[in-house]
């Protein structure tokens, strides 16, 4: 019987450089999304207080 040699891929450990790059990219992406969310909330708050100052809206319930 001829030898049953099958080419198996050699399993290597995780690449530290690859892990650092992937972690950095994911961290920056998540941070960017968080900053965009924060800026959007700031814009909404600023618009609310601008309308409140102009008298276009009120926080007092009218009877």
UniProtKB/Swiss-Prot annotation:
It comes from the Eukaryota. The chain crosses the membrane at residues 15-34. Keywords: Membrane, Mitochondrion, Mitochondrion inner membrane, Transmembrane, Transmembrane helix. InterPro entries: COX5C. GO terms for cellular component: mitochondrial inner membrane. It is found in: Mitochondrion inner membrane. This protein is one of the nuclear-coded polypeptide chains of cytochrome c oxidase, the terminal oxidase in mitochondrial electron transport. Belongs to the cytochrome c oxidase subunit 5C family. This is Cytochrome c oxidase subunit 5C-1. The gene is COX5C1.
């Amino acid at each position: 019987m001829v030898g049953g040699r099958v080419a198996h891929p050699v399993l290597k450990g995780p690449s530290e450089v690859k892990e650092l790059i992937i972690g950095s990219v994911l961290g920056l992406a998540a941070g960017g999304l968080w900053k965009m969310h924060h800026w959007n909330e700031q814009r909404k708050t600023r618009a609310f207080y601008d309308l409140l100052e102009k008298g276009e809206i009120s926080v007092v319930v009218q009877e």
